[in-house]
Amino acid sequence: MNLLLTNDDGYGSEGLSALAQKLSQKHNVFIIAPDGNRSAISHGITMYKKNRVKLVEKNVWTCSGTPVDCVITALKSNILPIRPDGILSGINKGANLGTDIVYSGTCAAAREGVIEGIPSVAFSLEYVDNKLEYFDVLADFASKNIEKLLMCSDVQKEKTFVNVNAFSYPKYKGIR
């Protein structure tokens, strides 16, 4: 699959790196992420000025705008060689549940993907004992289940993205 990855924690975040590392083993991965932290920016888009996009390495770009700007830029410009089959946002530092979803740039990027007609999933990792570890465990879960998760994203009728939240544990017993 051709997958576009982004987030709201910024290009250098541990969650994005873990997700990219796992998914690139089986899929074509393209990354465009904010050049800095844009947490809680919601569905903001940049108006009245151009976003700066910088190629960091092959198939990896930073953008001076918001997570939604990243998705729009990737889809509306000519930087991607192909339209992605799915958009993945995260892995976010901290959960995105309840009203958090309204403020979350992570969720907004996935929402924008669905608006553009592409199945999308947001991933978030919740702190345990004030620690945030094990991004690789959630990234591994994402890699093993990405096809199923993207099938649950309804881009036609309901216009919904999938929002995955997990505790920062060294392993998972299952899902619900």
Q: Each PLM stretch: what is its role?
A:
Residues F135-R176:
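Electrostatically charged, flexible surface regions
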Residues V114-V137:
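Glycine-rich phosphate/pyrophosphate-binding loops
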